[in-house]
């Protein structure tokens, strides 16, 4: 099964474009499928038209990433969180923090910013600030929130494990790359491991692993993005973020099992 994000070409920002995905998938997909409705700063009416029984949720990029679907208008965010009956899935990075950090990096290195600056530009603080805002909005409006690809130790402290999964209104996921790589790997892997949110410190990685073990993070996902090796080999600002992980996720988790990180039972639980 797969659940596809809306930052495709074209972006799934209208009911017509969303339905087109379902129509095409019904003809060619060999797997179970579902699609997220996309949000932007100016398509609130389209988002609220979405039938929650037909989609896996609405996706909000609270920080700009691949596809340029940033939603940073507070009125729009309030409208989605207050008016939507769907699961709201958020990419949480604070855009202003990223822009400020990026400007400082460009002032020092120009267009030749080293990849090692990626977790400095898209910092842990940017993630925490945005995740905190998403949780504030969800709590205010009793919305069903799912925060995607948690990557920092500080964020893991936001989530609970003292209530049953079926009763949670706020859930979180981690992705394979944030469970595997650390910022020490940039020296050898370069832009090939450029993701948003960024791969961060070993302390962050280990905290995310522990949050999975303790059930504060509920799901392990792939964040699959089919970028080519040629695209990923560009300089920092030109190389797209993301990578193809559908085919690598389970082998990587089995390696983590053999390394004593996760039990097989935990892997089954978090990927099912």
Describe the role of every protein-language-model region:
Residues 1-97:
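Divalent-metal coordination cores built from histidine and acidic residues
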Residues 9, 62-154, 219, 224-228:
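Divalent metal-binding pocket/active-site signature
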Residues 15, 96-112, 129-130, 155-163, ...:
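Histidine/acidic-residue-rich catalytic or RNA/ligand-binding cores of hydrolases
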Residues 33, 58, 91, 145, ...:
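Divalent metal-coordination and catalytic microenvironments
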Residues 37-41, 64-79, 146-161, 195-209:
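Active-site glycine- and acidic-residue-rich loops that bind
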Residues 52-58, 84-86, 141, 163-170, ...:
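Glycine-enriched alpha-helix->loop->beta-strand junction motifs that scaffold or abut catalytic
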Residues 112-133, 137-142, 192, 213-214, ...:
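His/Asp/Glu-enriched, well-ordered alpha-helical/loop segment
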Residues 139, 150-183, 207-222, 226-227:
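Hard-cation-handling environments
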């Amino acid at each position: 099964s797969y659940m596809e994000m809306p930052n495709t070409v074209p972006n799934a920002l209208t009911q017509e474009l969303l339905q087109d995905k379902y129509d095409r998938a019904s003809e060619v997909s060999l797997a179970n499928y579902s699609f997220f409705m996309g949000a932007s700063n100016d398509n609130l009416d389209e988002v609220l038209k979405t039938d929650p029984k037909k989609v896996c949720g609405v996706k909000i990029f609270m920080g700009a990433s691949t596809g340029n679907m940033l939603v940073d208008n507070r009125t729009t965010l309030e409208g989605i969180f207050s008016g939507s009956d769907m699961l709201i899935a958020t990419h949480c990075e604070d855009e202003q923090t990223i822009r400020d950090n990026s400007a400082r990096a460009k002032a020092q290195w120009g267009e030749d910013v080293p990849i090692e600056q990626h977790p400095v530009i898209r910092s842990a603080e940017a993630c925490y600030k945005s995740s905190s805002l998403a949780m504030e909005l969800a709590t205010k409006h009793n919305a069903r929130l799912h925060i995607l690809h948690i990557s920092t130790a500080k964020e893991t402290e936001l989530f609970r494990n003292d209530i049953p999964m079926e009763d949670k209104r706020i859930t979180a996921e981690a992705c394979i790359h944030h469970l595997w790589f650390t910022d020490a790997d940039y020296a050898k892997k370069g832009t090939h491991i450029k993701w948003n949110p960024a791969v961060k410190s070993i302390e962050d990685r280990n905290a995310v692993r522990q949050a999975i073990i303790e059930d504060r993070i509920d799901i392990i996902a792939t964040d699959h993005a089919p970028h080519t090796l040629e695209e990923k080999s560009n300089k920092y600002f030109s190389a797209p973020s993301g990578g193809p992980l559908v085919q690598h996720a389970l082998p990587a988790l089995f390696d983590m099992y053999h390394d004593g990180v996760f039990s097989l039972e935990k892997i089954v639980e978090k990927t099912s």
